Amino acid sequence: MKLYNYQLIIEYIGTNFVGWQIQKRGVSIQGEIQKVLRKFIKKDLKLLGSGRTDSGVHALGQSAHFIINHKIKPKKILKTLNHFLKKKGISILSIKNKKQDFHSRFSAKERKYLYVIINREAPLTLYRNKAWHIRNKLNFNLMKRGAKILEGKHNFSAYRSSSCGAKSPIRTLKKIQIK
């Protein structure tokens, strides 16, 4: 039986979610998308993401994939998914047919993160739930010096859980910008 592997690129506002991964309590991004996919495709499937996000974390382009035993029309399912997910703050940016060996997590070549800090006294309006609000004055020169120390290859063993499945604790931080 031939299997078809489909990649989704996903954007979401994570404020009202427990994170990416399905959990016993709370609503997850993975769970919401998987529910709509199963309803539309009428098959049991598992949506696998490129990584897990914590509660309240947003994504601009997270990769996920699922494998099924029949072809689908990506444009049609894209419209359907977005119709049912838009009210939840989830958008599917694209769906692509991939090779059998593609895996969202293990095929990823890099991950990009954006942390937004707004440094002012006034409360956040437009960036509420989308930025870290720091009222105390920040020392940007010191922050830039610290960022330079973090750039490069480092061993992150101290930050891993004992059940971490990653092959290596070594990671390379290519670029950190403080603006």
Task: State where each predicted segment sits.
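Structured-RNA-binding interfaces characteristic of tRNA pseudouridine synthases
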Residues: 1-179
